[in-house]
Amino acid sequence: MRTLTTSNLEPGMIAAEPVVTPLGQLLAPAGTEFTRQLINRMKLYKVESAIVLGEGPRDTDVEAEPKPAARVKTHAEKSKTHSQKVAASDEFRDFQMQYFDAIDYLRNVFTSATTAHYTIFVDALVNSVSDLFRSRNTIVELFDMLFNMRIISDSVYSHCLNVGLISRMIGRWLKLNKHDLNILTAAGLLHDIGKIKIPEEVLNKPGKLTDEEFAMIQMHPKYGYDILKNQSIDPRIKKAALMHHERSDGTGYPSHLTEEFIDSFAMIVGIADVYDAMTAARSYRAPLCPFQVIANFEHDGYQKYNTKYILTFLKQIAAAYQNNRVILNDGRGCNIILLNQTALSKPMVQMDDGTIIDLNTNRDLYIKSVI
């Protein structure tokens, strides 16, 4: 093995160890072949060097002791969580590379769109993420991948990418035609473009925002609309940037619109936006599991969101996890066996001893995590 500066890396070399950013974000796992794209991404993330496999006696030393490592790995495999198994899969490795490619493209669109005479091409934008949704037809498959990407990348760009993908999934459930699916996907991808006008120290502040800082954040929908308003793109994309924080009951921002004045795509993107935010880790809380998010939506979502859109979303999310193994808040594991249509966050579960518990009638119990 040998250490090379990023500028001396060449396509075809193999990473001997994971490639990580100065902030600890994984760019590529060990064993990845360096491509020109990956090397450029390393420069973008200010990764100064990498350890690569190379000629020499140390390579022999590295390969001379595979058996003990293999035995440890086999033992560890037995105790891996579902998330860890996903992260170790070839499918996730492919998804990860496609995801970073999409992030790079989206970052370029965001920064370029603030300059004069830049044209956003919706077809190219949607095509930049097409590999991420074409081969993943179920919400569980997609969310498994997105959950593991959070550990690696949790930026405005990754959030917008997630919202674009989730919005498209909702559009599929609503049986939108392909053209509208593409417009909805683009609306999700661009919904937070206005945040590029917000100082990073405010966007990434770990603690509670001051009133002044929160007021600054609340300007991002208007900033986004201002960036997009002169683009020759579908008006629904512009409206999604402006209205995705509006709520049906008039409690949203920036204009406190009620449902009849909110664009339908903005309402769909708003649901995807909140779901992605709730399932992300924050300095003040751990990420919420899907059933905790459903419970939050059930608590106040029916009046804040379009009924058709929110019920379609919640029913599909809950149904996707039927028969999954989950952990309750008291630490016990069980399997979801039947959904409660009037309380989707409180399904019936079967314990390991065969006992069936209706969480809707056992109000002290709730699903804490999906495994």
Predicted regions and their residues:
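Terminal helices and disordered tails flanking the catalytic cores of nucleotide-processing hydrolases
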Residues: M1-A116, P287-I371
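Short, contiguous strand/loop micro-motifs
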Residues: G24-L27, D154, D211-E212, G252
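Acidic/His-rich, divalent-metal-binding segments that scaffold phosphate/diphosphate chemistry
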Residues: T74-A215, L228-Q231
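Alpha-helical scaffolding flanking metal-ion-dependent phosphate/phosphodiester catalytic sites
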Residues: V163, I183-K197, A215-I310, A319-Y321, ...
